[in-house]
């Protein structure tokens, strides 16, 4: 069974801004983005090291999931996955 990883406050804040942006155009688009993203986040727990190593942090336990032009940064902890941030691929992370 795939579990939803731990979502950091920073990630939730960034996701809220993204969903707010999409919902201005279409609530359905925002909902579709959200539900598909959650499915991808659940899949991280299965072989998390298959994702690319984060280039900014450059730690073996910090990886990137690419989703619809966004980079989802996550850390592999001993007993769970922690989602750290989400940003558009062409923006500088953590700015």
Where are these regions (language model features)?
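Enriched for short, Lys/Arg-rich terminal
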Residues: 67-71, 75-95
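Generic beta-structure capping elements
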Residues: 10, 47, 86-89
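A short, surface-exposed loop/turn module that caps and links secondary-structure elements
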Residues: 39-66
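Arg/Lys-rich, positively charged N-terminal/basic patches that mediate binding to nucleic acids
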Residues: 1-34
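GIY-YIG nuclease signature motif recognition
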Residues: 11, 37, 74
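Conserved acidic functional residues
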Residues: 14, 64, 69
